[in-house]
């Protein structure tokens, strides 16, 4: 396998086969780096970040015996994206009112008026 960084990029999740050194991605086939919500669309509590990180570890551990490929990395990213949507729907996560753009990419906020 070449020293090409594998990556998965979704709206709210970025995963790389790399480590971060001096704000640069350095290829490391034995390491996955997770970047959650790079555009700061959501307001995150420490607990909600931990839930996403724990689920990420669970998905990576499940994949551990298989070869890492673009497909498997995209699958992990898609499952994390769905998990973030669930956190938002369950009220454990909210949109960031100070976000650069308010586009409600995962649906309108759930408020009493809309329920």
Swiss-Prot record:
Membrane topology: Peripheral membrane protein
A Pfam family per the record: NdhM
Keywords from the named record: Membrane, NAD, NADP, Plastoquinone, Quinone, Thylakoid, Translocase, Transport
Name the record gives this protein: NAD(P)H-quinone oxidoreductase subunit M
Swiss-Prot/TrEMBL catalytic activity: a plastoquinone + NADH + (n+1) H(+)(in) = a plastoquinol + NAD(+) + n H(+)(out); a plastoquinone + NADPH + (n+1) H(+)(in) = a plastoquinol + NADP(+) + n H(+)(out)
Oligomer and partners: NDH-1 can be composed of about 15 different subunits; different subcomplexes with different compositions have been identified which probably have different functions.
InterPro entries: NdhM (IPR018922)
GO CC list: plasma membrane-derived thylakoid membrane
